[in-house]
């Protein structure tokens, strides 16, 4: 036979009508309804009139009510092992079956009917329990959501910490490597300086040793002559007089006398003043710590029709006649410019350009998106950063406004150092590799790819036809290129 009633529903049917809890020591009245023994006794004590069944309102005799043994056995069978006994009211000794919503406390049925909680809104404990369980579940869910957020935050913090530690380890390794390289370079310069001083010293000492050896030889010869003359002085009078002139002439031989004024003090002049050691070494190291020169070539597709490229697209000069070249967006059609075939969008880069004895030239970098049609707008606002020479005497930086540059002499080789992330483009007088002299520095927020640009300027009827050259990275000293040939 299958059961049609669930356990929770069965428990509801086994509840006392007074305390609304599962029967405890159930008693059956004459009308057939059952109540907890404690509930029935408490109800009888508080009534002055005859006892009536709370369910059917039939008059009954509470003192003659018999235990409902069958119901008690069913309840005993349904009760799980280890279930705690229900708490009871301290006033009526009845189970705490109700919850006073006003006072927020557990009460028994009599407290709600006759006690201090009379007329207060009350709710069965099971209902309150279910409601509070739902509230607890909602609170737990909310806490889980907060815990999830905290877990995500912890994961982000751990990842951030791990990343910081890793980046710190990498940067520390880079610092150690860079300082090791600097120590190596300093040791090289130290050895170079000491070797130079040692060589200079050895030359001076060798010269002095030679003079000292000659002087000592002269001294020995003079001592020998002195000894001979002293012995000659012991001769008898006649012999002394006869030989005196010959002996005196021998003592006066030029090779036996040191030359007057033959000694001239030699000064130690190594070509390096003590106070300038750090500055001189720094100038040498500065070039070594710059990036290796870039092996650049020129891009024929960008060259103005008057420009002639040669030597593997490393030499450019402005010719007298325009060449037939396809008109394309990347080609300059007015300004005599040409770009390098490779641009830079990050990192540190160094390259050099030989300008020789040209009277007019410009060079620098240009944004890849800058217009190449019409006259070139030479200003940082238009994505062009240049310096140049005009009429063989005026050096200027094409900033806003233009900045005259106090350049000493006429450098034949210009070095360019680009630090993309730092937003710096610095130009150097690179005629002396060990003594790069800064000419000007642009500060900018670079965006997009930058290309090295060379502007030969107009040929001026041949007076400014000398070429500009991208020298090979290992090229020693200023380059004097041959005359380029037309493409």
From Swiss-Prot:
GO molecular-function term, one example from the UniProt record: ubiquitin protein ligase activity
Assembly behavior: Can form dimers and trimers. Interacts with several E2 ubiquitin-conjugating enzymes, including UBE2L6, UBE2E1, UBE2E3. No interaction with UBE2H. Interacts with BECN1. Interacts with SQSTM1. Interacts with NLRP3.
Family the UniProt entry places it in: Belongs to the TRIM/RBCC family.
Role of this protein: E3 ubiquitin-protein ligase that ubiquitinates Beclin-1/BECN1 in a 'Lys-63'-dependent manner enhancing its binding to ULK1. In turn, promotes starvation-induced autophagy activation. Also interacts with p62/SQSTM1 protein and thereby induces the formation and the autophagy clearance of aggresome-associated polyubiquitinated proteins through HDAC6 interaction. Also promotes NLRP3 inflammasome activation by directly inducing NLRP3 oligomerization independent of its E3 ligase function.
GO biological process, one term: innate immune response
Biased composition (Pro residues): 469-481
Region annotation (Disordered) ranges: 468-487
UniProt binding sites for Zn(2+): 89, 92, 111, 117
InterPro entries: B30.2/SPRY, B30.2/SPRY_sf, Butyrophylin_SPRY, ConA-like_dom_sf, PRY, SPRY_dom, TRIM/RBCC, Znf-RING_euk
A cellular component term, taken from the record's GO annotations: cytoplasm
Family matches, as SMART domains: BBOX, PRY, RING, SPRY
Protein name per its UniProtKB record: E3 ubiquitin-protein ligase TRIM50
Residue stretches in coiled coil: 125-169, 204-235
Gene3D superfamilies found in the cross-reference section: 2.60.120.920, Classic Zinc Finger (3.30.160.60), Zinc/RING finger domain, C3HC4 (zinc finger) (3.30.40.10)
Domain B30.2/SPRY, chain residue ranges per copy: 276-475
Annotated compartments: Cytoplasm
Entry EC no(s): 2.3.2.27
UniProt modification remark: Auto-ubiquitinated.
Record-annotated membrane-spanning stretches: none
């Amino acid at each position: 036979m299958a059961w049609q009633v669930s356990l929770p529903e069965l428990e509801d049917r086994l509840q006392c009508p007074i305390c609304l809890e599962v029967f405890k020591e159930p008693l059956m009245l004459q009308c057939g309804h059952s109540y907890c023994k404690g509930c029935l006794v408490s109800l009888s004590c508080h009534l002055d009139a005859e006892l009536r069944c709370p369910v059917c309102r039939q008059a009954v005799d509470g003192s003659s009510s018999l235990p409902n043994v069958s119901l008690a056995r069913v309840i005993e069978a349904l009760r799980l092992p280890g279930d705690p006994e229900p708490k009871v009211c301290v006033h009526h000794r009845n189970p705490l079956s109700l919850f006073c919503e006003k006072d927020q406390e557990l009460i028994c049925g009599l407290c709600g009917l006759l006690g201090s909680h009379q007329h207060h809104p009350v709710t069965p404990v099971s209902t309150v329990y279910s409601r509070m369980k739902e509230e607890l579940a909602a609170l737990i869910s909310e806490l889980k959501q907060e815990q999830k957020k905290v877990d995500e935050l912890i994961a982000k913090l751990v990842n951030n910490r791990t990343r910081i530690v890793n980046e710190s380890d990498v940067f520390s390794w880079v610092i150690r490597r860079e300082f090791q390289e600097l120590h190596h370079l300093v040791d090289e310069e130290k050895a170079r300086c000491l070797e130079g001083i040692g060589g200079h010293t050895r030359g001076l000492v060798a010269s002095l040793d030679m003079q000292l050896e000659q002087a000592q030889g002269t001294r020995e010869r003079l001592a020998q002559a002195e000894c001979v003359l002293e012995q000659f002085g012991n001769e008898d009078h006649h012999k002394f007089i006869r030989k005196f002139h010959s002996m005196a002439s021998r003592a006066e031989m030029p090779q036996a006398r040191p030359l007057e004024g033959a000694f001239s003090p030699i000064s130690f002049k190594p070509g390096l003043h003590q106070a300038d050691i750090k500055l001189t070494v720094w100038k040498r190291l500065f070039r070594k710590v710059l990036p290796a020169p870039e092996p650049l070539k020129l891009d024929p597709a960008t060259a103005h029709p008057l420009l002639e490229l040669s030597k593997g697209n490393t030499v450019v000069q402005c010719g007298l006649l325009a060449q037939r070249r396809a008109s394309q967006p990347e080609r300059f059609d007015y300004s005599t410019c040409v770009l390098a075939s490779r641009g830079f969008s990050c990192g540190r880069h160094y390259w050099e350009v030989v300008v020789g004895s040209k009277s007019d030239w410009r060079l620098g970098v240009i944004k890849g998106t800058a217009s190449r049609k019409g006259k070139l707008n030479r200003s940082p606002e238009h994505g062009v950063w240049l310096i140049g020479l005009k009429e063989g005497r005026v050096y200027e930086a094409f900033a806003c406004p233009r900045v005259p540059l106090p350049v000493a002499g006429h450098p034949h080789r210009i070095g360019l150092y680009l630090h993309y992330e730092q937003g710096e483009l610095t130009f150097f007088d690179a005629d002396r590799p060990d003594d790069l002299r800064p000419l000007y520095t642009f500060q900018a927020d670079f965006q997009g790819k930058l290309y090295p640009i060379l502007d030969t300027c107009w040929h001026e009827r041949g007076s400014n036809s000398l070429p500009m050259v991208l020298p090979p990275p290992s090229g020693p000293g200023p380059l004097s290129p041959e005359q380029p040939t037309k493409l």
